[in-house]
């Protein structure tokens, strides 16, 4: 069990994103990245408690990374990334190589301060975006959505507001319909879901599951 594996994607409707100026897009990108960083930190905060409970109450054996035979695992999966790149390219996805390199390289970044500058000078349109996720109101995913809304409202001087709808409320709890609603841009404009859900619509989301 890898306690630091995160496979969530924070996605915004393409038409809405493309309607923004490049400067506005940078603000959205920054707020989205910081919201994801925030979700990751609060999500991982309970790892030790979870591992203790699994070991002490559920008889789960956990082997630390440094005690695992990683080299033999790497040998066993050698070539899988090249194979999947070829599969994607055969389906017309020319960006497959760049995506795989991005998601398989070592991450040397660190958590950033969860704040943004006031960029209300960028002539933002007044809009309300609906954020959805499949987990509950008290989940870290929903908290990530609220953090994004907080950052966007500050950055835009209140022009962009974000409503958070947990448990895919806007599509009666149906995750697949929620993704379709995101693609349509109505009633969902932003969502956070596992790559397993997104990959049903686009196989490139499976890149993050490569060994």
Show which residues each predicted segment covers.
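N-terminal secretory/targeting leader peptides
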Residues: 1-211
């Amino acid at each position: 069990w890898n306690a630091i594996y995160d496979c969530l994607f924070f996605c915004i409707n393409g038409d809405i994103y493309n309607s923004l100026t490049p400067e506005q897009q940078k603000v959205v990108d920054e707020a989205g990245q910081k919201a994801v960083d925030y979700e990751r930190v609060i999500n991982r905060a309970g790892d030790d408690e979870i591992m203790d409970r699994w070991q002490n109450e559920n008889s789960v054996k956990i082997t630390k990374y440094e005690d695992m035979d990683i080299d033999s695992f790497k040998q066993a999966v050698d070539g899988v990334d090249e194979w999947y790149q070829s599969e994607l390219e055969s389906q017309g996805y020319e960006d497959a190589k760049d995506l795989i390199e991005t998601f398989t390289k070592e991450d040397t970044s660190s958590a950033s301060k969860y704040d943004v500058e006031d960029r209300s000078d960028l002539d933002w349109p007044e809009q309300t975006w609906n954020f959805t996720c499949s987990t509950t109101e008290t989940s870290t995913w929903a908290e990530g959505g609220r953090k994004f809304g907080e950052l966007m409202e500050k950055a835009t001087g209140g022009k962009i507001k974000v409503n958070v709808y947990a448990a895919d409320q806007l599509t009666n709890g149906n995750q697949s319909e929620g993704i379709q609603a995101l693609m349509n841009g109505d009633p969902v404009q932003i969502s956070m879901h596992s790559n397993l859900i997104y990959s049903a619509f686009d196989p490139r989301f499976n890149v993050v599951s490569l060994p």
